Amino acid sequence: INGGVDEKSHEQCGPNYAPITSEYLNYDEVLPKYVQMLDWLAGLYVNVLNLIQYMHDKYYYEEAEMALIDTDVRRTFATGIAGFSHVIDSLSAIKYAKVKVVRDETGLATGYEVEGDFPKYGNDDDRADEIGVWLLRTFLEMIKKRHTYRNSEATTSILTITSNVVYGKYTGALPDGRAAFTPFAPGANPSYGAEQNGLLASLNSVAKLPYHWALDGISNTQTINPEALGHSEEERKENLVQVMDGYFDQGAHHLNVNVFGKEKLLDAMEHPEKEEYANFTIRVSGYAVKFIDLTREQQMDVISVSYTHLRAHE
């Protein structure tokens, strides 16, 4: 939108092409420019990773690990996606609503005002979810068409661990309404506050992403209030198993599930010295971690993830 210029530093960080100067964003104008920028970024990404892999080899990183392997090795080239849901919702907002650009005194876009409603990823709405499928396929194709070190097989992931917090710190406002320099939603999770139709609709959206296009992982983290799963312990276990079975039956592969109340997290954050929290472990996008070992900013990000309540009709 800004023609490759960073709105915070005012530096030319990407390819120098004509910025969008209109008051409202037009989907047919934004999409080709986004694809152009994404293709440039994919090329830069692969080039940097090629250098990293070469340096690993130079200092015997891989040789030491694989010295005893006497078979042909299938080499993969891992890449990853962050801010996935925000791109989907941003393109959806531009396509289905009206997005007004807020500019600074130099004319650079620094914020956006969304007028009207638009379909959001995470609600089992094909209008938004199909943008996600297109985005994943397009990015992987851009990676695959480039030379990779040792002719390795290009793969990708939608899995951020806790880096979504760091990446968000350096990313300005987006057309989906996300404020500047705030955390991205983790992994393949819908954007914060986007889920309006309950847990099952959210899972259905993520399950539509073809796993064979993201063999390094499509991470989805859900924190569920125990009461949302039923009244008794047995009922909760049974309902959770059914939810997970339904998700994986659709071809999904990775689900991080936390079942506890928000109050427990808040108390652990304020009173980490309590004995009960010494080994209190939660699932974060891709791995398990002791909650009290996270930074306060990371803890707040975990707490910000929407607590899901199963709707009556589900």
PLM regions with names:
Residues I1-Y17, R150-L209, N220-Q222:
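Catalytic nucleotidyl-transfer cores of nucleotide-processing enzymes
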Residues T308-E314:
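Conserved small/polar residues in nucleotide/adenosyl-binding loops
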Residues Q53, A64-M66, V101-G187:
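Internal maturation/activation junctions in enzymes
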Residues L135, F139, I143, G193-S202, ...:
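Unusually extended, aromatic-enriched hydrophobic runs near protein termini
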Residues I1-G116, L199-V305:
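Structured mid-domain segments that build the active-site/substrate or prosthetic-cofactor binding neighborhood
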